[in-house]
Amino acid sequence: MTLAAMTAAASQLDNAAPDDVEITDSSAAAEYIADGCLVDGPLGRVGLEMEAHCFDPADPFRRPSWEEITEVLEWLSPLPGGSVVSVEPGGAVELSGPPADGVLAAIGAMTRDQAVLRSALANAGLGLVFLGADPLRSPVRVNPGARYRAMEQFFAASHSGVPGAAMMTSTAAIQVNLDAGPQEGWAERVRLAHALGPTMIAIAANSPMLGGRFSGWQSTRQRVWGQMDSARCGPILGASGDHPGIDWAKYALKAPVMMVRSPDTQDTRAVTDYVPFTDWVDGRVLLDGRRATVADLVYHLTTLFPPVRPRQWLEIRYLDSVPDEVWPAVVFTLVTLLDDPVAADLAVDAVEPVATAWDTAARIGLADRRLYLAANRCLAIAARRVPTELIGAMQRLVDHVDRGVCPADDFSDRVIAGGIASAVTGMMHGAS
């Protein structure tokens, strides 16, 4: 089956479900992935997704139950900024905002939605903590969904069981979604999105603890991701990065299948043997007693978690969740360095020395001299373009980074001064 035939068949949903469209080989799958991973168009839209850990202020060692959290959300009216609310495997709450016309509109909408969600949870005796990793509680899954049950089983059967459980239930992030932009600029744009990763991780690192202990890392969240299978969670770029669609296709076909959904029952089960998707699509292995379909391929792509993921747009996935005082400035900085063409050109030079320093950024952050210099250069570029509404947040971030301080340092200081429980409770009550 050619790509054109496969795509046409997959789009005829009135006559045939995509589950019925079998992919004949890995070449067709690769073409399907590469051709659909980014969409040609102008820059400008920004979408934000923000996760926060849900705690009980009266007992921060307790993990609120699925029933407690969902009862609040069931009574929640539509949010003013249009965000959709969901619950992560460990009970973290996520706000997923719609695409907005520009970064300022996206920040404003998310700020309004956060305020409504916080108020609703507070009325139920619960609170939100914006940290990259849960500093207090052991990993426990509370979301009963079949996808997360299968994901848990997959990680338990692999060498990444411990970090997999931590990733699912004990981490929280800010995700920034941006237009892919004009096709002729895709390669440079995707390369820069990756190259900015270590510097932005160092700026926003906010997870010095996990499960009641200091980890020795500024971004324990990023460390957790680094401990997992690089075939699923590592950067997607090939040697040159000149062809992001081809790189993404190779990455996706090499990655092992995590779970399979039955087209008849929609039951989801974990794949506990190591089966690269290419083996399934080429018929070397049958899963669920059959060959792979378009629906299987589309679902497989949702189980891959690189730091920059193409989904027609770009998902930037490497930022720790950070407090209100700085997250608007962090988001503005990243968006400006990617979407403003002059700022992007300057950023390429600023981050080139540390473009692959992912582990160093997560471990010691701004204590690394090269990351410190890159971070200050990037913030200077963004600060020259900051709108009036964000001057205060940007100045706080600039001052912090100039002193070599990230949010993880602030949280660590509060833990040392008053204990973990007090520091967590303080964040629910507004301490930054």
From Swiss-Prot:
- Is ATP-binding there in the keyword field? yes
Question: Which top-level enzyme class is recorded in the Swiss-Prot or TrEMBL entry?
Answer: ligase
* Record SUPFAM superfamilies: Glutamine synthetase/guanido kinase
Q: Which GO terms describe its molecular function?
A: ATP binding; glutamate-cysteine ligase activity
* Entry-linked Pfam families: GCS2
Q: Pathway, according to UniProt? A: Amino-acid biosynthesis; ergothioneine biosynthesis
| Keywords in alphabetical order | ATP-binding, Ligase, Nucleotide-binding
Q: How is its activity regulated?
A: Weakly inhibited by L-methionine-S,R-sulphoximine (MSO) and strongly inhibited by D,L-buthionine-S,R-sulphoximine (BSO) in vitro.
**Catalysed transformations (reactions):** L-cysteine + L-glutamate + ATP = gamma-L-glutamyl-L-cysteine + ADP + phosphate + H(+)
- GO cellular component labels: plasma membrane
Membrane among keywords: no
The EC number(s) attached to this protein equal 6.3.2.2
Q: Which GO terms describe its biological process?
A: ergothioneine biosynthetic process; glutathione biosynthetic process
Task: Determine the domain of life of the protein's source.
Answer: Bacteria
Any extra remark in the record? Was identified as a high-confidence drug target.
For this chain, the family text in UniProt reads:
Belongs to the glutamate--cysteine ligase type 2 family. EgtA subfamily.
The job of this chain, per UniProt, is described as: Catalyzes the synthesis of gamma-glutamylcysteine (gamma-GC). This compound is used as substrate for the biosynthesis of the low-molecular thiol compound ergothioneine.
UniProt name for this protein: Glutamate--cysteine ligase EgtA
Q: Which species does the entry assign this protein to?
A: Mycobacterium tuberculosis (strain ATCC 25618 / H37Rv)
From the broadest rank down, the organism's phylogenetic lineage runs: Bacteria, Bacillati, Actinomycetota, Actinomycetes, Mycobacteriales
